[in-house]
Amino acid sequence: MNFTKRPFLLTILDGWGYSPEVEGNAIHAANTPNLDDLLETYPNTLLSASGEDVGLPEGQMGNSEVGHLNIGAGRVVYQDLTRINRDIGNGDFFKNPVLKQAIENAKAQGSALHLMGLFSYGGVHSHMKHLRALIEFAKDEGITEIFIHAFLDGRDVSPRAALEDMKEHVEYCNNLSVGKIATVSGRYYAMDRDNRWDRTEDAYNAITRGDGVYYSKGPVDAISEGYGRGENDEFIKPTVIVDENGRPIGRMNENDTVIFFNFRPDRARQLTYAFVNDEFDNFERKSHPKVHFVCMTEYDEKLEVPIAFPSEELKNTLGEVLSKEGIKQLRIAETEKYAHVTFFFNGGVEKQNEGEERCLIPSPKVATYDLKPEMSAYEVTEELIERIGSGKYDVIVLNLANMDMVGHSGIMEAAVKAVEVVDDCVGKIITAIKEVGGEAMVMADHGNAEKMVEFCNNTERQCYTAHTSNPVRCIYVTQEKRVELQKGRLSDVAPTILKIMGIEKPPEMTGVPLIKNT
């Protein structure tokens, strides 16, 4: 290794997508003197961050998990969504031994099968196609009592997409003569990932005890009533569906079988722990039925549960290669994106590499981040600048979460503020890097804040809260002259960093360095 311009800082600005559209573009509307200066001064390009270029189905928008996996792996990582879709298509899904055993357990016990997960076509955490494949699998195996616990989205799809989706799904189940929605909860409650256990508790109680915040005679009514309270899909309070006598139609009992069909781990962990961890103490479980619990993918290596689609091992990720070279690394982010710069960036491996330090800055405890668009960016920046000055690290991986997390609110003014906060922080961080003679790459993992509105029927304007499939910026902050970057995809970033540092790219990395040969 002949790299002397240390540290090298990889700055991932979550949700910093590129779009020429002006209307509803918080990035265009914001005052960003620092990012503008970097784009004018240093080599930069656009990277594909969605669809087949990141291992997703064609046209599927990217997300933080997928983005960090591809960036850290230096190759296109075929995602769980793609794998599961493939198995449904070729029939292997219906032979999956873990899923088959779960269904056999329900048959043997004469008990109910509960399917819980994000009720969404978004394809980020789950997909309706997978839920329906499970229903059809169970029906074909003779299961008649199937209850669905629907977690409503409103972030990776339109804020109120669930109502029409639910109407369609109820008709689908009626046609099959099997499958009933037992509970409805916004993902804000059922899929919290920031240790706000009171939210998880509300969802857990609805699912296990039939103890809801609200009760409704049907799932379509439950959603409509939530809208009447001013709640979008994401925030609909846990609602239990009851029969004509007011009794929960799908309360969970001993020996029932549960399949959690989310394939993305980070927002599935807390609720799973509440179900399967005997030592659980984050809230009092008033009911804890012993069930046969199956996870669609591996949510956490500490969870001892059957996994339908185990992780595929990724060898020689960027962090692993740097570790073998004796390079000291720092990973730093606030809570919302900490798992992304550690677990996901390392190829879905929780264990730290040798020589890798981690720094977690707590995210603010607010209901939604539009209430505090700066989140903890300034605290992250202050800590990072101090660590840059220490001279201890060779490579630093940073995530600033604001443009993504505030972008999900759909509130334009808050998103503009988030962009401006990030710009301010980037300016301070790049100044600190230059002062010690380091270099940096400033990029994103997927788009979000560049699209805050959409138009229905070409006329009706509404908030847009999902990610986008737009390309993302990539800037190489260097004093080297005559450097040019070519267009590429996220998986080209790790090979580029290795080339900059004079380290040979391992054969597993199929990405191509972005630096043009001059």
Curated annotation (Swiss-Prot):
Substrate binds at H125, R155, D156, R187, R193, R264, P265, D266, R267, K337. Transmembrane segments: none annotated. Binds 2 manganese ions per subunit. Gene3D superfamilies: Alkaline Phosphatase, subunit A, BPG-independent phosphoglycerate mutase, domain B. Its cofactor is Mn(2+). GO terms for biological process: glucose catabolic process; glycolytic process. Coiled coil: none annotated. Belongs to the BPG-independent phosphoglycerate mutase family. Pathway: Carbohydrate degradation; glycolysis; pyruvate from D-glyceraldehyde 3-phosphate: step 3/5. It is an enzyme of class 5 (isomerase). The gene is gpmI. The active site is at S64 (phosphoserine intermediate). This is 2,3-bisphosphoglycerate-independent phosphoglycerate mutase. InterPro entries: Alkaline_phosphatase_core_sf (IPR017850), BPG-indep_PGM_N (IPR011258), Metalloenzyme (IPR006124), PGAM_B_sf (IPR036646), Pgm_bpd_ind (IPR005995). Its EC number is 5.4.2.12. GO terms for cellular component: cytoplasm. Mn(2+) 2 binds at D14, S64, D445, H446. Mn(2+) 1 binds at D404, H408, H467. Keywords: Glycolysis, Isomerase, Manganese, Metal-binding. Catalyzes the interconversion of 2-phosphoglycerate and 3-phosphoglycerate. One of its GO terms (molecular function) is manganese ion binding. It catalyses: (2R)-2-phosphoglycerate = (2R)-3-phosphoglycerate. It holds the Pfam family iPGM_N.
